[in-house]
UniProtKB/Swiss-Prot annotation:
This is Rho guanine nucleotide exchange factor 10-like protein. The keyword ATP-binding does not apply. CDD domains: RhoGEF (cd00160). Disulfide bonds: none annotated. InterPro entries: ARHGEF10/ARHGEF17, DBL_dom_sf, DH_dom, PH-like_dom_sf, WD40/YVTN_repeat-like_dom_sf, WD40_repeat_dom_sf. Its main location: cytoplasm. The gene is ARHGEF10L. The lineage of its organism: Eukaryota, Metazoa, Chordata, Craniata, Vertebrata. Residues 1-93, 159-193, 1089-1117, 1140-1161 are annotated as: Disordered.
Length: 1233
């Protein structure tokens, strides 16, 4: 019944009536958009025809529901609908249960979003509408007022009815997955009229996209009218951007719509157009196959199971198993109809991106796919149990598989929705690569790529969480209810970080392998659990659906007590006297005197062969000494040949060491606490696991290390979401605060931080596990100084888990900026081809450039810490150097007086030409505060304007205003994908601009995410900005650091998820945010430099001194064969040596082709023709597919250290540095494998 009072602001999940007055536009942050068809005829017959249940109180002001058949439609296919019917014969409401709904006239109902509750329900009676993405064709959209509606903003006309608006691609599309977009425009957001001034092209884009949608989807709209019996849009919720729309189930006719089909290829197409047509054909073919798979799930499995008597599977279980399959099919059926229309007119429009945006940017798609993904594990569990307990069901699945043409199982069909969006992403990436700049489809493709990536990321995260819950539940079932482990697992405070099946090995007293067995190892956030795997089930069932194992817990231990120990590790890290090594039948203590405190684990044959080579080398050296006493001169028996034997044996020893290292790459040795011995002394026992590949071992070692760091007080918790539940844990990928160190070793001077860069340098001395646990290898260069005094540079080594200072040197003036300049790819290749250079000073190496306050520009080599200044110069007019950037052509310096100085490369391309006068360009009247180097352009900021320069000629192309306030300056610019995020000298907002159109796309208010940490703090300013690994780091002048997720791919890097705030920050402004990245390969035990220099150094040894290996520091693997070896290192023939040939045979013909050294059984000497194989040994099968490992750390610099977690209840604690000391905080990110 109607109420005289205005309705209150609706809460999330409340039911809304379509006609109820919504909140005013001033109070809304994201009102979204309501697509409606204008209709005024026959509305009163709608609810009676549909039989809609009334789930909300009736109101007199509610408009009746709209029946699409009431709209006059000219059907191109009159035979599709029988005459005399108000509803087409091929439209129905699905299940028979719908007949129970009748008599409702004015109604609307809502279902709460499945993401708002921990557990979703399976509605038995409520049927849901599927598709609401049909654009409205309201004539109001073409009025002049519509031009004021911006792409990512909500600037509504005062008093305009929301139902009549049509924004084309509106905020509801682009913010559909945002979880806190309502906070972006609340405080300190300028009026829309100011924003329009720097968006001249975006409104044109919106109109063009709208026009394209109207022209390209007209047939789609008509088809939707014919095929959808109900389309309902709700009013927008007040402060929520989530569209909790109802879903009414709609059955689609069996009559197939026309399949999308490309016409014949026109003549005169460019190569890119031809490729785009082929990619479109792949999209059409892939989508058709996917829709057919969804139909097979319903027609071949769900419908027969529902109709089967007696039932092999109950109706309730069928609903659970096939939950949301029909809705997904309806979504893609609509998309296929729209795709068919777009394909038919492809040669005239060549646009496809806007279709993906319109079809998959709605929260409805995320809802149905989220429900499906969350339900997938439970559905497979029901199928598995039914196969084990109901033979009729198992026989049904086998029969259906045999009858299918491709023999795909039900599991193979049901896993396709999980794989669908990654397939879309790959196709759109290919399409974007072949779409030139300026093409009308390019921006829409970038937006579509962003939407699909965001959707896929959310689904992946939900799938990961669902699998994590399933694994913990499966593990909990194997534990007794009364055990302490059960209480820990069921407390809800445990987070599964890593879970994998490893092979546990047991060795004998002499190191021989006795037995091995697979174990399931669980790494939780505070404990490590090992369980036996017990598979029970028929083999024929596992071919139809994956069978989950049952676990029997073998042992569990607290994480801080677990230690990773490498074979041959020094005894200083643990007490070998109390270590128990698992042997067959019993555990025996390893005496400290046995085997020189070294334990040989694994196949001992490699160690034995290495020892044999050592003994043989000693014998050959004695022979060499005897040969030196010969009085005669012989061609094949002299000191040259003898030294060649020695060098060859040394090389073979290195090959054997490589094999030992390779075996150790997959061997994970864990030292665990054991029961005390009889005297009460604590003991430990060693467990050895074999990982599936080297990457797996690296992942385990890294996650174990970071999980221990995560248990420290400062990381409990380390990150908070402003509105998250206190019981929830931060995502497993969150950076972990690893250490807090003083920025300068000398505290006598009050030095202020200026800049920081990371110089990646691989350390060949680090072991396999040390690389997995250490920070990104290389050196940190930290620069700063004191106002009016000198500057200082501090160099830290990161080749250990905690940084340490290795060098510090003073400068004449404070350091304001730094830039790391890597070597060009062609330079690196030329250096690899010619490793020796005539002039060592001309050797190409990465460099580090420093800009000082007195106008000096200094260039240093970054290979070592010798800190030799390679070149230096003074800026024009001795202006302070505020920023430095490099491009392939120039070293760019932004100066205080608004000048951009460009230094070209030298003629040899090794260094920058700092001696000649630079190319100078005046950017503006104010200082050039930041520079950004793109592929084909350079962006320079001066005040609120940004100037775009051509990369090679530095000619200004265009400029634009990034901020409407002339007193505000652009201070930071960072690029991600096809966008650039900017921060300003004042204000709490950051803005996103497109790299190609220069249009303003999004604005985020940082203050809304920090108010709960700094209550009452109104004046907040962004002081630093960084994008790395899909995360946007924002530093503020209050010492707070905010983390926002952004897309990683080539799309638009708009922020769509919730931000997180670090509880660890600084006492003052965050001076800078920098990233340290090093790329490692699985074969990281020896660097290329060490391998390349090794043979040269040995060849230069005059005495042929034997290399002293350390065979007892590694574990090897068995050789598959043992053959004779030709001891030949450098000599291919001794014919050139003086003296006769010592042989009882006749000399061979002197044709120059025969070798005096014949191979005894030397198949191993295939390596003789390839020197690199000598060094690198033969490739290991497990290393055939090598991947890069990316180690990442984030460094922030500022005054002091503050833990905001303790500050919430008190004034905060400051440790370990003082408030005024310059401090570095280093966050470590899990290895990107």
């Amino acid at each position: 019944m109607a109420s005289s009072n205005p309705p209150p602001q609706p809460a999330i999940g409340d039911q809304l009536v379509p006609g109820a007055p919504g909140p005013s536009s001033e109070a809304e942050d994201d009102p979204g958009e309501a697509f409606e068809f204008d209709d005024s005829d026959d509305e009163e017959d709608t609810s009676a025809a549909l039989g809609v249940p009334s789930l909300a109180p009736e109101r007199d002001t509610d408009p009746p529901l709209i029946h699409l058949d009431s709209i006059p439609v000219t059907d191109p296919d009159p035979a599709a609908a029988p005459p005399g019917t108000g509803v087409p014969a091929w439209v129905s409401n699905g299940d028979a249960a719908d007949a129970a709904f009748s008599g409702a006239r004015h109604s609307s109902w809502k279902r709460k979003s499945s993401r708002r509750i921990d557990r979703f329900t399976f509605p038995a009676l409520e049927e849901d509408v599927i598709y609401d993405d049909v654009p409205c064709e309201s004539p109001d959209a073409h009025q002049p007022g519509a031009e004021r509606n911006l792409l990512y903003e909500d600037a509504h006309r005062a008093g305009a009815p929301r139902q009549a608006e049509d924004l084309g691609w509106s905020s509801s599309e682009f913010e559909s997955y945002s979880e806190d977009s309502g906070e972006e425009a609340k405080p300190e957001v300028e009026p829309a009229k100011h924003r329009v001034s720097f968006q001249p092209k975006m409104t044109q884009l919106m109109k063009a996209a709208k026009s394209g949608t109207k022209d390209g989807l007209e047939k789609t709209r008509m088809a939707v009218m014919r095929k959808v019996s109900f389309l309902h849009r709700k009013d927008v919720l007040g402060d929520s951007e989530e569209e909790d729309m109802g879903l009414l189930e709609v059955s689609v006719s069996d009559i197939k719509p026309p399949a999308p089909e490309l016409g014949p290829m026109p003549e005169g197409l460019s190569p890119q157009q031809v490729v785009r047509r082929h990619i479109l054909g792949s999209i059409v073919q892939s989508e058709g196959s996917y829709v057919e798979s969804l139909k097979r799930i319903l027609q071949d499995y769900r419908n027969p199971l529902m109709e089967m008597e007696p039932k092999a599977l109950s109706a309730r279980k069928c609903q659970v198993v096939f939950f949301r399959v029909k809705e997904i099919l309806h979504c893609h059926s609509m998309f296929q109809i729209a795709l068919s229309s777009r394909v038919a007119e492809w040669d005239s429009t060549e646009k496809i991106g806007d279709l993906f945006v319109a079809s998959f940017s709605k929260s409805m798609v995320l809802d149905v796919y989220s429900d499906y993904v969350n339900n997938f594990t439970g559905a497979m569990s029901i199928i598995k149990k039914a196969c084990l307990t109901k033979p009729a069901f198992l026989e049904f699945l086998k029969r259906r598989q045999v009858c299918s043409s491709d023999r795909v199982t039900l599991y193979g069909l049901m896993v396709k929705p999980i794989q669908r969006f990654p397939q879309f992403i790959l196709l759109l990436q290919d399409m974007l690569k072949n779409t030139p700049r300026g093409h009308p489809d390019r921006l829409s493709l970038q937006l579509a790529l962003t939407e699909l990536e965001t959707l896929a990321e959310k689904l992946n995260e939900q799938k990961r969480l669902a699998d994590q819950v399933a694994e913990i539940q499966q593990l909990t079932k194997s534990v007794s209810d009364r055990s302490s482990l059960n209480k820990l697992l069921t407390s809800g405070q445990r987070q599964l970080l890593l879970c994998e099946t490893l092979t546990e090995t047991v060795y004998g007293d002499r190191g021989q392998l006795i037995k091995s067995k697979e174990r399931r190892v669980f790494l939780l956030n505070d404990m490590l659990v090992c369980a036996n795997i017990n598979f029970k089930g028929q083999l024929e069932i596992s071919s139809l659906v994956p069978l989950g194992p049952k676990y029997v817990v073998k042992w569990n231990t607290a994480l801080p007590q677990v230690q990773v120990v490498e074979v041959g590790q020094d005894g200083g890290t643990y007490d070998k006297d109390n270590v128990l090594i698992q042997h067959s039948g019993a555990k025996k203590a390893s005496a400290s005197g046995q085997a020189q405190n070294k334990v040989y684990l694994g196949p001992p044959r490699l160690f034995q062969e290495l020892q044999d080579l050592q003994k043989d080398l000693a014998v050959v050296e004695q022979i060499t000494l005897l040969i030196s006493t010969l009085h005669g001169t012989y061609q094949n028996l002299n000191m040259t040949v003898a030294q060649d034997w020695c060098l060859a044996l040394q090389r073979l020893m290195r090959v054997k060491e490589e094999e030992i290292h390779s075996a150790n790459k997959c061997r994970l040795r864990l030292l665990l606490p054991g029961k005390p011995d009889k005297s009460g002394r604590p003991t430990s026992f060693m467990v050895v696991f074999i990982t599936p590949n080297p990457l797996s071992k690296i992942s385990w070692v890294n996650r174990l290390h970071l999980a221990k760091i995560g248990l420290r007080e400062e990381n409990q918790p380390g990150w908070l979401c402003p509105d998250e539940d206190k019981k929830s844990k931060a995502p497993f990928w969150c950076p972990i605060l690893a250490c807090c160190i003083p920025a300068f070793s000398s505290r006598a001077l009050s030095l202020q931080l200026g800049a920081l860069v990371h110089s990646p340098v691989n350390c060949p001395l680090l072991g396999f596990s040390a690389v997995s646990t250490s920070l990104p290898q290389g050196y940190l260069w930290v620069g700063g100084g004191q106002e009016g005094a000198g500057g200082q540079v501090e160099i830290f080594s990161l080749n250990r888990p905690s940084p340490r200072t290795v060098k510090s040197f003073p400068l004449a003036a404070p350091v304001l900026c730094m830039e790391y300049i890597p070597e060009l790819e062609e330079e690196a290749e030329s250096r690899d081809e010619s490793p020796t250079a005539a002039d060592p000073s001309a050797t190409v190496h990465p460099t580090i450039c420093l800009g000082l306050q007195d106008g000096s520009i200094l260039l240093y080599g970054s290979v070592d810490t010798g800190t030799q200044c390679l070149a230096s110069c003074r800026s024009p007019g001795l202006q302070p150097v505020l920023c430095l950037r490099h491009s392939p052509f120039y070293l760019l310096a932004g100066l205080q007086d608004g000048t951009l100085a460009a230094y070209p490369r030298t003629s040899g391309g090794v260094l920058w030409d700092l001696e000649s006068p630079p190319v100078c360009l005046t950017v503006g009247p104010g200082p050039v505060r930041t520079l950004l180097s793109l592929e084909d352009a350079v962006w320079a900021s001066c005040g609120p304007r940004v100037t775009v320069l051509e990369a090679t000629t530095l000619q200004p192309q265009q400029s634009f205003e990034a901020h409407q306030d002339e007193a505000v300056s652009v201070t930071h610019m960072v690029k991600a994908g096809s966008g650039v995020w900017m921060a300003f000298s004042s204000g709490t907002s950051i803005r996103l601009f497109h790299t190609e159109t220069l249009e303003h796309l999004q604005e985020i208010n940082i203050a809304t995410r920090t108010t709960f940490l700094l209550p009452g703090q109104k004046h907040l300013c962004v002081t630093s900005l960084l994008i790395c690994q899909g995360l946007l780091w924002v530093g503020t002048d209050q010492g707070v650091i905010v983390l926002l997720p952004v897309p990683r791919l080539e799309g638009i890097p708009k922020i769509t998820g919730k931000g997180m705030v670090s509880l660890n920050g600084h006492c003052g402004p965050v001076a800078f945010l920098a990233v340290a990245i090093s790329i490692l390969a699985p074969d990281i035990l020896r660097s290329d430099q060490e391998e390349a220099e090794g043979p040269r150094a040995e060849e230069e040894k005059p005495d042929g001194q034997a290399h002293q290996p350390m065979p007892d520091s590694h574990v090897g693997r068995e050789l598959t064969r043992k053959k004779g070896i030709l001891l030949q290192y450098r000599l291919r023939s001794t014919a050139h040596l003086p003296g006769p040939l010592l042989s009882m045979r006749e000399p061979a013909p002197a044709d120059g082709a025969a070798l005096e050294h014949s191979e005894e059984d030397g198949s191993i000497y295939e390596m003789a023709d390839d020197p690199d194989v000598w060094v690198r040994s033969r490739p290991c099968a497990r290393d055939a597919h090598r991947k890069e490992i990316c180690s990442v750390a984030i460094i922030s610099g500022g005054q002091g250290y503050r833990n905001f977690g303790s500050a919430l209840g008190s004034s905060g604690r400051l440790a370990p540095c003082g408030e005024t000391d310059s401090t570095l905080l280093i966050w470590q990110v899990p290895l990107m494998l």
